[in-house]
Amino acid sequence: MMAISNAELRERLLFSLPEDARRRTAKLAQLNDRYLPDKEHDQALKAGIATIFEQAAKKPTRGFVEGKIVLVTGESGAGKSKAIRNALAQQKAAMGGDLDHLFVECLAPSPCTSGQLAMAVLDGVSYQLVRELRENVAWRRARDQLKRIKPLAVWIDELQHILDHLQSEAEAVKFLNTVKTHVLMPQWPPVSLVLSGLPVLKQLAAKDRQIQRRVHEVILHPLSFPKDADRVRRNVVGIIKNDVGLKIDAAVVSDEFIARLIHTAAGALGLSIKLVDEAAATAFGNGRDTVTLRDFADAYARETGRPASENPFLVDNWHLVRPWYADAVALAKIQAAAPQEKAA
């Protein structure tokens, strides 16, 4: 049997869906491809990423310049990955030319050992592995590839996954020494790091003074009401009117609704955007021209499977309902913190 392409498989999957689901899914695909700007996050990340390029532009001393570490932390669903990718893309555009080779992007697998992280870096530089390597060999090969490519920055996303492997203070220090030796090498241009993940990563960086003094920290703080009400309301209006081209029911921009939305998203900016995307796509899929509270309720029910009595968009005492996303955020926090508590 001949294999079909991913594009053809997707077309067949879409064709198998009911008309409303097909329209909704197609619209969500469009929304997922765009980046929704956020002034607060974007400015903080722009300043952080800029330190990498300012450092690289310095005149070398003794033939090299130290690399920087930009540590980006935020709870699950905060929108870290998209925001970092956007900040790096803007910096590349400002420099001009084809500079993709100057930026290595890799994802820490889950679970993750030090050796597996080295292989993730090798994957990020498109190095073809035919078999799994021992930890020391993997890091040595990663170092050789980084020396060859000379990237300005290596971005490791979801780095909290390494914490499950670091069960003691000694293991954490050994890992940080490995990173210093094989990634933050004395050379020009310097290799800098962008490390992103849950807030517990700050504790890991604090275990090494040489690492800590290089860190520029960017914290993507959770949303709160009423502090971020206007910020979230702008997103609601921008997504529904500009991105999807629909009208907005007055109730959907009220303070009471914005508070519901922030609560349901567990204060995570990225999740709040996802909820608005899903609701707008629901109305679009059903062929209606106005997004209402019911679209948010339907989208939440479809995504989570929760009954009406546990749907924050339906019940009067919504602030007493623990949203599904809050459980997911809390679980990620517990899993990341446990190894650090054991090591302490």
Residue ranges and their predicted role:
Residues 1-20, 24-33, 225-227, 234-344:
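C-terminal alpha-helical "lid" subdomain
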Residues 9-22, 117, 127-189, 252-253, ...:
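Mid-core helix/loop region of P-loop NTP-binding domains shared across ATPases and GTPases
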Residues 27-47:
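Dynamic helix-loop-helix/coil hinge segments at AAA+ ATPase domain boundaries and subdomain interfaces
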Residues 48-64:
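Pre-Walker A adenine-sensing motif
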Residues 93-122:
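AAA+/P-loop NTPase substrate/partner-engagement loops
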Residues 161-166, 174-256:
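The catalytic "switch" region of P-loop NTPases
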